[in-house]
Regions:
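N-terminal secretory signal peptides that target proteins for export/translocation
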Residues: 1-6
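Bacterial N-terminal signal peptides
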Residues: 9-21
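Boundary of Sec targeting at the N-terminus
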Residues: 24-27
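Short, contiguous alpha-helical
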Residues: 34-38, 42-45, 55-101, 141-182
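Membrane-proximal, proline-rich intrinsically disordered regions
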Residues: 51-52
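Acidic/histidine-rich alpha-helical segments that form the ligand environment
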Residues: 103-140, 151-160
């Protein structure tokens, strides 16, 4: 190989070799979803702590969940949704593949402190299970009909934001400013 050809090829090979690890480390969809879940976690848990116990029993009208019931529902689904990706919810939750187990979990009597502790544990579980999902598994079917594992994790994230918005409305209806808006 001639010296002039080597001067052209060597830098190209070096650049390609340096770019490969950078491309392999590019954040994937799970990194983006986890970032979003962590942000929602901070806000939902922050609202739960900021709202006095008297506001936890408030509901906007008959048939609507109370504030406490929304926190418990978020907790339950943080355990239930990963089940659709093949995870096993902690045994003490009683949550399995049948959605009726979610209803049973939500009906348990709890104090405010118990709800706060369980809410935080459920987010830790959700994040752990999302983190354990390799990008290659995202295109595979979940246990739920017509839903890929990717769609399941996206649904989990949008579910959190749906209830975050609901909880913001509940807080403001009770003249409580969300902590991040102060």
């Amino acid at each position: 190989m001639s010296y002039s050809l080597l001067r052209v090829i060597a830098p190209a090979i070096l650049c390609a070799a340096m770019a490969a690890p950078a491309a392999a480390q590019a954040p994937g969809v799970m990194d983006d979803l986890l970032k979003d879940v962590r942000e929602a976690r901070g806000k939902i848990v922050g609202l739960a702590k900021a709202m006095p116990e008297s506001a936890w029993e408030w509901r906007p009208g008959p048939g609507a969940r109370s504030t406490k019931e929304v926190f418990v529902h978020v907790t339950a689904d943080n355990y239930f949704i990963p089940v659709g990706a093949g995870s096993t919810a902690p045994a003490e939750t009683g949550i399995g593949e049948d959605y009726k187990t979610v209803g049973a979990f939500e009906q348990r009597t709890r104090t405010r402190e118990q709800v706060l502790a369980e809410l935080d544990k459920s987010f830790a579980f959700l994040e752990q299970e999302m983190t354990a999902t390799p990008e290659a598994k995202l295109a595979t079917p979940s246990k739920w009909p017509k839903m890929s594992t990717r769609q399941l994790w996206i649904a989990s994230t949008t579910h959190l934001h749906e209830h975050l918005g609901q909880l913001i409305a509940y807080a403001r209806s009770n003249k409580i400013t969300p902590p991040w808006s102060r």
